């Protein structure tokens, strides 16, 4: 499908949440699959709620996820003159008009209709359709409404009566609604700024967007968008509305379900690859495949494989994926991620590079891995877990004996095979249980009792460091 152009168009009123990240991913993959372009537009016309902090977080979230966009970022707020130009064109064509109805009254009528279970369809009561604002009839209407020439209007798009509006959605199929269910659409606010409903149509048209993939919560807006597209004789893009993401309990996703923003997952120690894989599988599938590389995702992605039911968050599945990607990552790359804000000596980096081979199999998160590996970089005396501290207190004599015994082993013999045989010999010689000996080594050398094999750790740390830790107790 040539010439595909998709976009991600978040509103910067908060951080990049998981639903938005999935929408961005689907648009990115669809464009990549078809050799097209993926654009980023910041919809910041709501100046009261939009913040630079949120804009920065969205851009950083996409960067962290590894989704690069084509061209420059488009800021909707910088296109207001274009929006006003198109709105005026609609007024000139008779497809939109200035409405002076008090906004609080309109809101009150809508609220009352909702309470009564009815649909409120607003039609301006202050301007007859055939009346021009400069006419005597128009001025009389102002007077009767208690208005003055200083009253500021909104611009409303005229929704045609009794027209069937049809969306050919790539996920839900054909969806219809009658225009009588829609009220006239505000396209310019009283301060002359565009509403989302209107600006998005103009911006998508001007950017040459061919395919719009977004959440199903936008479905009702799409009916309005279609009317505006038709009134302007714009080419209508293809639409695909993706079911929303629910929490594990099946309810709409909210903060009570835990981490919902991308930056939360980054702080937890989720890898970008794992997050992309996880987001992809939230509502999209390729047979029974769970582990999907970026190359496979680009090759396989299609809209037909997106389900119609809401996807549910599954943190256990995310942990499983993250563990897979951590386990298959090189020790050097993991070390780079772990030490972004830490400086270590070359010796301690060497400990970690060797120790990560075993430790990374145990970690579901990078933060967890850093905690598991901290004994490699601590200086004695180590911080002891409660269990390790109890063992040290109960086995001080054994620890001193082991320090003396191990100090007599030559550096050339400090390897797994020789150490194992000598430690067993020491236990036998001093009539000690081998389990007590291993515990008495593990507690002071690692500070924890659930680390990997103690002999492997001792080989990595080397003779001098092991003796130093045993003697520091």
Swiss-Prot record:
Highest taxon above the source species: Bacteria
One GO CC term on file: cytosol
Signal peptide: none
The entry's keywords: Aminoacyl-tRNA synthetase, ATP-binding, Cytoplasm, Ligase, Nucleotide-binding, Protein biosynthesis
Localization: Cytoplasm
Catalytic reaction annotation: tRNA(Glu) + L-glutamate + ATP = L-glutamyl-tRNA(Glu) + AMP + diphosphate
A biological process from GO: glutamyl-tRNA aminoacylation
Classification via CDD domains: GluRS_core
GO MF terms held by the record: ATP binding; glutamate-tRNA ligase activity; tRNA binding; zinc ion binding
Short sequence motif named 'KMSKS' region, residue ranges: 252-256
PROSITE patterns attached to this UniProt entry: AA_TRNA_LIGASE_I
Family: Belongs to the class-I aminoacyl-tRNA synthetase family. Glutamate--tRNA ligase type 1 subfamily.
Subunit relationships: Monomer.
Function comment: Catalyzes the attachment of glutamate to tRNA(Glu) in a two-step reaction: glutamate is first activated by ATP to form Glu-AMP and then transferred to the acceptor end of tRNA(Glu).
Name of the featured protein: Glutamate--tRNA ligase 1
């Amino acid at each position: 499908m040539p010439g595909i152009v998709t976009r991600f168009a978040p509103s910067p009123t908060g951080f990049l949440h998981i639903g938005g990240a999935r929408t961005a991913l689907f648009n990115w993959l669809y464009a990549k699959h078809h050799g097209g372009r993926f654009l980023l537009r910041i919809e910041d016309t709501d100046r009261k709620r939009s913040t630079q902090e949120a804009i920065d977080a969205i851009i950083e979230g996409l960067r962290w996820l590894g989704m690069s966009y084509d061209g420059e970022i488009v800021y909707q707020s910088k296109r207001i003159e274009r929006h006003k130009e198109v709105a005026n064109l609609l007024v000139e064509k008779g497809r939109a008009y200035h409405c002076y109805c008090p906004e609080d009254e309109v809101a009150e009528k809508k609220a009352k209709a909702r309470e009564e279970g009815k649909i409120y369809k607003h039609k301006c009561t202050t301007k007859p359709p055939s009346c021009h604002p400069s006419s005597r009839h128009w001025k009389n209407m102002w007077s009767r409404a208690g208005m003055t020439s200083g009253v500021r209007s909104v611009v409303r798009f005229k929704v045609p009566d009794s027209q069937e509006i049809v969306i050919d959605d790539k996920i839900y199929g054909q969806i219809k609604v009658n225009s009588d269910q829609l009220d006239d659409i505000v396209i310019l606010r009283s301060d002359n700024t565009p509403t989302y409903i209107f600006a998005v149509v103009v911006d998508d048209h001007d950017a040459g967007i061919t395919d719009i993939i977004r959440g199903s919560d936008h479905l009702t807006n799409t009916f309005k968008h279609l009317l505006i597209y038709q009134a302007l004789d714009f080419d209508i893009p293809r639409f695909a509305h993706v079911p929303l993401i629910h929490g594990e309990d099946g309810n709409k996703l909210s903060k009570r379900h835990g981490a919902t923003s991308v930056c939360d997952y980054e702080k937890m120690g989720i890898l970008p690859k794992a997050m992309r894989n996880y987001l992809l599988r939230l509502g999209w599938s390729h047979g029974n495949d769970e582990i999907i590389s970026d190359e496979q995702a680009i090759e396989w992605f299609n809209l037909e494989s997106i389900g119609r039911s809401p996807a549910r968050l599954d943190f256990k599945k995310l942990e499983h994926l993250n563990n897979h990607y951590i386990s298959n990552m090189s020790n050097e790359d993991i070390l780079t991620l772990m030490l972004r804000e830490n400086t270590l000596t070359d010796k301690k980096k060497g400990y970690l590079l060797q120790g990560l081979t075993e430790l990374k199999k145990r970690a579901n998160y990078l933060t967890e891995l850093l905690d598991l590996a901290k004994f490699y970089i601590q200086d004695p005396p180590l911080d002891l877990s409660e269990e390790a501290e109890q063992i040290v207190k109960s086995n001080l004599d054994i620890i001193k004996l082991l320090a003396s015994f191990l100090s007599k082993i030559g550096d050339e013999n400090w390897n797994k095979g020789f150490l194992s045989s000598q430690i067993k010999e020491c236990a036998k010689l001093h009539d000690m249980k081998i389990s007590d000996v291993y515990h008495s080594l593990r507690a002071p050398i690692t500070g924890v009792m659930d680390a990997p094999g103690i002999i492997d750790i001792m080989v990595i740390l080397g003779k001098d460091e092991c003796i130093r830790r045993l003697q520091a107790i």
